[in-house]
Amino acid sequence: MTLIAILTCAAALVLHTTAAEELEAESQLMEVGMPDTELEAVDEERLFECSVSCEIEKEGNKDCKKKKCKGGWKCKFNMCVKI
């Protein structure tokens, strides 16, 4: 019973941390001061850059090297976030 409680607590903590990181990433994107339409385009572009590029390279039987986010951004939870 104790093990189940510990595992449940750990899972809740991981989910909470992930949600908090995503909220932080969104708030950092909003601080840039771009209009919403431009912000959505940048967000989609950066999300693709982090998460899909590695999968495309793997399909070609090559070593997977994730693309790095550029211009003061870093990849975190498959999203580029402002440093």
Curated annotation (Swiss-Prot):
Keyword Signal attached: yes
Keywords: Disulfide bond, Neurotoxin, Postsynaptic neurotoxin, Secreted, Signal, Toxin
Keyword Iron: no
Coiled coil: none
MF (Gene Ontology): toxin activity
Disulfide bonds: C50-C64, C54-C75, C69-C80
InterPro entries documented for this protein: Hwtx-2-like
GO cellular component, one term: host cell postsynaptic membrane
Record-linked PROSITE patterns: HWTX_2
Tissue expression pattern: Expressed by the venom gland.
Propeptide span(s): 21-46
Location(s) in or outside the cell: Secreted
Signal peptide: 1-20
Described function: Postsynaptic neurotoxin.
Family assignment from sequence similarity: Belongs to the neurotoxin 12 (Hwtx-2) family. 02 (Hwtx-2) subfamily.
Name the record gives this protein: U4-theraphotoxin-Hhn1x
UniProt source species: Cyriopagopus hainanus
Lineage, uppermost ranks: Eukaryota, Metazoa, Ecdysozoa, Arthropoda, Chelicerata
